[in-house]
Amino acid sequence: MAWPCITRACCIARFWNQLDKADIAVPLVFTKYSEATEQPLPAQIPRSAAAPIDTQPGGDARAAGGGDAAPGPARPGTAPHGSPPADSVMRHDYKPWKVQRPEPSCKPKSEYQPSDTPFEKETQYQKDFRAWPIPKRGDHPWIPKAGPSPVLGPERGSPEKAAQEKRRKKEEEAEADEEHPKAARPGDAREKGRQRGDEAGGQEGRGRAAADALNRQIKEEVVAAGVSSSYRNEFRPWIDVKPVKAIKAKAQYKPPEEKMTHETSYSAQFKGETSKPAPADNKFLERRRIRTLYSEPYKEPPKVEKPSVKPSKPKKTTTSHKPLKKAKDKQIASGRAAKKKSAETSNTAKPEDKEKSKEMNNKLAEAKE
């Protein structure tokens, strides 16, 4: 067992004899497992050296002379009372490991071994795709230009081309054909006679001819080498292959020609109870309908015509006094109208009535006094 639970009382009480006491102790306390299992005797008996397995290098000396350790000279860190070193947990009682001969490592040495042949400075990509010469500003070789003299235009680049080919082939290889220098000789004479025409024509034709000559030279170098680029060798276009005809996939869903009914199978199978006719012969259902207060779900209750009497609405008691104000305004308006009418009637009354009314008023005033 490895590190049992020794904090609970149940684990301490149960199977105590079956536990390995060396697992419970701190690992560095015991140098041998036999010291944990065997109980120390009062008289130290010399143990056999082959039985235990030492965990520290200094265990052989202690195992061989276990009984003689006490009378011998004590170690320079042990207690003065001469306790055996097996009981000590001090650091100086355990000698460190001393490895005199280290084992040879199986890991290979990572030493740089230079190759016999030097590396190429130019990569395959640089070989296949070389830089084109930069033409003059505004001179695009892919745009055909109409020269000043259309008759002498195509012949203008031939002497310069021949001269450049001659120089290149002299520098590169001596195995060039003899036709090139022969073709170059009449070109030299033409050049001398044509220099005067070039001066009049301008310098545009010269730059154009030089760019064309360089482009042809690069193309000829590639063809003369006989080796196209590795990318062209690996990825070549298909020849004599007909283009594939586009295939239109058939539609998997075919819509029905006739008109679709928007009724699902669920709605067709489970319809409402209103469509079921009520059985008229069943007296039990009629009695039950009379007894119960509820009407059947598939029978509509008979509609009773209610008398059309409008219930009197209770007056709303609101905090706002708008309806009262309206009533007061109506009363004031009616009073004003009555006064106006009385004034109009009084104006039309006779002056005799006015005098009578004055007399009556005077009599009343005298009576009050």
UniProtKB/Swiss-Prot annotation:
<comment type="similarity">
    <text>Belongs to the STOP family.</text>
</comment>
<comment type="function">
    <text>Involved in microtubule stabilization in many cell types, including neuronal cells. Specifically has microtubule cold stabilizing activity. Involved in dendrite morphogenesis and maintenance by regulating lysosomal trafficking.</text>
</comment>
<dbReference type="GO" id="GO:0008017">
    <property type="term" value="F:microtubule binding"/>
</dbReference>
<dbReference type="InterPro" id="IPR007882">
    <property type="entry name" value="MAP6"/>
</dbReference>
<dbReference type="GO" id="GO:0030424">
    <property type="term" value="C:axon"/>
</dbReference>
<protein>
    <recommendedName>
        <fullName>Microtubule-associated protein 6 homolog</fullName>
    </recommendedName>
</protein>
<feature type="compositionally biased region" description="Basic and acidic residues">
    <location>
        <begin position="350"/>
        <end position="369"/>
    </location>
</feature>
<keyword id="KW-0493">Microtubule</keyword>
<feature type="compositionally biased region" description="Basic residues">
    <location>
        <begin position="312"/>
        <end position="328"/>
    </location>
</feature>
<feature type="compositionally biased region" description="Basic and acidic residues">
    <location>
        <begin position="297"/>
        <end position="308"/>
    </location>
</feature>
<dbReference type="GO" id="GO:0070507">
    <property type="term" value="P:regulation of microtubule cytoskeleton organization"/>
</dbReference>
<keyword id="KW-0963">Cytoplasm</keyword>
<keyword id="KW-0813">Transport</keyword>
<feature type="region of interest" description="Mn 3">
    <location>
        <begin position="228"/>
        <end position="251"/>
    </location>
</feature>
<dbReference type="GO" id="GO:0032418">
    <property type="term" value="P:lysosome localization"/>
</dbReference>
<feature type="region of interest" description="Disordered">
    <location>
        <begin position="251"/>
        <end position="369"/>
    </location>
</feature>
<dbReference type="GO" id="GO:0048813">
    <property type="term" value="P:dendrite morphogenesis"/>
</dbReference>
<dbReference type="GO" id="GO:0005801">
    <property type="term" value="C:cis-Golgi network"/>
</dbReference>
<keyword id="KW-0206">Cytoskeleton</keyword>
<dbReference type="GO" id="GO:0005798">
    <property type="term" value="C:Golgi-associated vesicle"/>
</dbReference>
<feature type="region of interest" description="Mn 1">
    <location>
        <begin position="87"/>
        <end position="110"/>
    </location>
</feature>
<feature type="compositionally biased region" description="Basic and acidic residues">
    <location>
        <begin position="118"/>
        <end position="142"/>
    </location>
</feature>
<feature type="compositionally biased region" description="Low complexity">
    <location>
        <begin position="70"/>
        <end position="80"/>
    </location>
</feature>
<dbReference type="GO" id="GO:0030425">
    <property type="term" value="C:dendrite"/>
</dbReference>
<feature type="compositionally biased region" description="Basic and acidic residues">
    <location>
        <begin position="179"/>
        <end position="209"/>
    </location>
</feature>
<dbReference type="GO" id="GO:0005874">
    <property type="term" value="C:microtubule"/>
</dbReference>
<dbReference type="GO" id="GO:0050772">
    <property type="term" value="P:positive regulation of axonogenesis"/>
</dbReference>
<dbReference type="GO" id="GO:0000226">
    <property type="term" value="P:microtubule cytoskeleton organization"/>
</dbReference>
<feature type="region of interest" description="Mn 2">
    <location>
        <begin position="122"/>
        <end position="145"/>
    </location>
</feature>
<feature type="region of interest" description="Disordered">
    <location>
        <begin position="41"/>
        <end position="213"/>
    </location>
</feature>
<dbReference type="GO" id="GO:0030705">
    <property type="term" value="P:cytoskeleton-dependent intracellular transport"/>
</dbReference>
<feature type="compositionally biased region" description="Basic and acidic residues">
    <location>
        <begin position="89"/>
        <end position="110"/>
    </location>
</feature>
<dbReference type="GO" id="GO:0005516">
    <property type="term" value="F:calmodulin binding"/>
</dbReference>
